[in-house]
Structure formats: structure tokens, C-alpha cells
A protein has these predicted regions:
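Extreme N-terminal starter segment of soluble prokaryotic enzymes
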Residues: 4-10
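Phosphate-binding site of ATP-dependent enzymes
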Residues: 159-248, 252
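Conserved N-proximal alpha/beta basic substrate-recognition cap immediately N-terminal to
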Residues: 15-132
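Glycine-rich phosphate/pyrophosphate-binding beta-alpha loops
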Residues: 278-291
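A long amphipathic alpha-helix within ATP-dependent nucleotide-binding catalytic cores
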Residues: 222-272, 297-315
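Rossmann-like NAD(P)H-binding beta-loop-alpha module
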Residues: 122-150
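Protein kinase-like catalytic core scaffold
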Residues: 153, 211-212, 257, 273-275
Length: 316
């Protein structure tokens, strides 16, 4: 338990994501921390380095009682974790949890292996590994994937955000084109969920609570992402949907996340299929359509954890 009076935390971000929507989120978190009487300093991954075999940057961390890792630089996160574990300093979210969400194949693997849990996942096949300099010299493997998934099929890079690395292959010709284009890049072949084409729900989870939810819809694209032209509206999530989102966050060991669900059985029934999970989900849009500031919820949660009033989420 830490006395939170005049406490300092460190918000670690990416040095190369400096456009307005990223910086705005950092400022929202800092302002939310201020409301909790917590000083939250900003540091990016060009200011703090994972260093081995010589004097490191550990001295820069001495003043902090917790870290919010709002980046996907997993190598840096693991270096930070080594330092923090020795001193009992919590990292929100943990490097393992961030990595579990960053790699979409890893997300599905962990959810499949979650003890005593059953999650409905998009039927997916992980593309076989090749290298950019080699390419796919033989694509016979695609025949068995076609039989398992059918067309149209979604081809999704394992590492990506805002729907930008997600493609729809209507036939074998398009599947081959994307397959060859992505040689050397980890990706998935996924079943196209027609009942949820262009529509999904985002549930924002903090701790064990769904704090806000919105429905996203696109009339022109199979992806519902707002960055691709989708529209948003506040959504009243059912208890079933909330339970699913919270179970997902717990299974992945996340403190907070955006959980995206698909309407696998149609919009007249609860969204029941996990699409993906974002450990660093942007929250401006969901704030605009629901009035809920997720930054406030995150900092309230962190303060409760630091004060020993709430247990953290742990995988398993």
C-alpha cells in the first residue's frame, strides 16, 4: 500500500506518435491524475532506453511510485519491468498484457488456453512463417485454409491499429495477392462474420467494470473502425456483453482495455464474439458519445490499487 498524497507516476508513450489525437490522450490522463492529487510526468521511448551491458537509465525512475505504459515498445517495457519488480513498483498495463493484445494471434492463443473459460473467437488460421527476402515460394497451404474459412475471408496483420492492416479477400486471386504482399509479416486468415459486417461494439473496461460502451457502424466498409469512416453511438451493453468483456480482460491480465465484440448471431442478439482487444485503446470518441472520460476511471482505479483498496487484475 502506498500513501497517495503528492505521489508521482510516469506515463511512458511513443516518441514518434505526436499527432493531436495521441497527445490529447496523454493530456487527459495527466489531468485525470491531477484530479486524484497525483503528479503524472510524461516520458517517451526516445528519452528512456532499454540498456544492457553498461550503465543504464534506471536513475531516471527513482522518483516514481508507478508507471503507466501507454506504448507497445515491448522491449522497453520488459526492461522497465525488471527494474520495477525489484522495487515493488507497479506497471499499468504489464508488459505481458500489452504484448498479449499487440499480437492478435497471441490474444487468441491466450484466450483459447484460459483456464475454466470459454470464449467465442473468430475462426482463424495463423499464416505460416516466411521471410520478406524469401516470400511465399509455395502457396499450396492456401487450399486447406480456403476449405476451413471460405470466401470472402478477412486477412489481418497480427500487429496493427485502427483497422488499417485489415483486408477483405473476396476470392482466391485476392487472397493470393494479400498473401504475397504480406510475406515476412505475421498475419491471420479469418472467417468473415457476415452477420456483423461493418458493425461492432467497443466496451471500455477498467478493472472489473465496463465503464462505457459504443456501437460503431460503417455503411461503406466491412470494418467498423471510426478511422475508416465509421459512425458511433452510445450503446447500452447487456449483462452478458459486460461479463464477456470483463472475463476477457481478466484472462489477459489487463488493468484496462477496449474490448471489441462482433454480433456473430445478428444485431438482434448480444454481441458475443471477440474481435480483438486493445490495451491502449483511445478514448476520446467513446467520451464524446457517452460522456464518460475513461482517463478519470483509469486514474481512480490506479489510486485504489496504490492505496490497497482494490486488487489488480491478474492473468488466469
Amino acid at each position: 500500500m502506498i500513501a497517495t498524497k503528492n505521489i508521482r507516476g510516469l506515463l511512458v508513450t511513443n516518441a514518434f506518435l505526436k499527432n493531436g489525437k495521441f497527445v490529447e490522450h496523454y493530456e487527459w490522463l495527466r489531468e485525470a491524475a491531477k484530479q486524484q492529487e497525483i503528479r503524472l510526468d510524461l516520458c517517451d521511448n526516445a528519452m528512456l532506453h532499454a540498456i544492457y551491458g553498461m550503465e543504464s537509465d534506471e536513475a531516471k525512475l527513482a522518483a516514481y511510485s508507478f508507471i503507466i505504459f501507454w506504448d507497445k515498445d515491448i522491449r522497453l517495457a520488459k526492461w522497465l519491468e525488471r527494474y520495477c519488480q525489484k522495487r515493488g513498483i507497479p506497471i499499468f498495463n504489464t508488459p505481458e498484457a500489452v504484448a498479449a493484445c499487440d499480437d492478435k494471434s497471441e490474444t487468441f492463443r491466450l484466450l483459447t488456453e484460459a483456464p475454466e473459460e470459454a470464449f467465442s473467437l473468430i475462426p482463424s488460421v495463423v499464416a505460416p512463417l516466411t521471410f520478406a527476402a524469401v516470400g511465399y515460394t509455395d502457396v499450396d497451404f492456401l487450399s486447406s485454409i480456403e476449405k476451413q474459412i471460405g470466401y470472402p475471408m478477412v486477412i489481418k496483420e497480427c500487429f496493427g491499429s485502427f483497422g488499417w492492416q485489415v483486408y477483405l479477400a473476396k476470392d482466391r486471386k485476392e487472397a493470393l495477392r494479400y498473401t504475397k504482399k504480406l510475406a515476412g509479416t505475421p498475419f491471420l486468415y479469418q472467417k468473415f462474420i457476415a452477420a456483423s459486417a461493418g458493425v461492432d461494439v467497443r466496451l471500455q473496461v477498467v478493472g472489473t467494470e465496463v465503464v462505457a460502451a459504443m456501437k460503431r457502424r460503417s455503411k461503406t466498409d466491412f470494418r467498423a473502425n471510426l478511422s475508416n469512416g465509421g459512425q458511433m453511438e452510445a450503446y447500452e451493453a447487456s449483462q452478458e456483453e459486460c461479463d464477456l468483456a470483463v472475463r476477457t480482460v481478466l484472462a489477459l491480465g489487463l488493468d484496462f482495455a477496449g474490448v471489441d465484440l462482433l454480433f456473430a448471431s445478428g444485431e438482434d442478439k448480444p454481441a458475443n464474439m471477440i474481435c480483438e482487444v486493445n490495451s491502449n485503446a483511445h478514448f476520446r470518441n467513446i467520451a464524446e458519445c457517452t460522456g464518460v472520460n475513461t482517463a478519470d476511471k483509469i486514474m481512480q482505479y490506479i489510486k485504489r490499487v496504490l492505496e490497497g483498496k482494490q486488487e489488480r487484475n491478474h492473468r488466469g
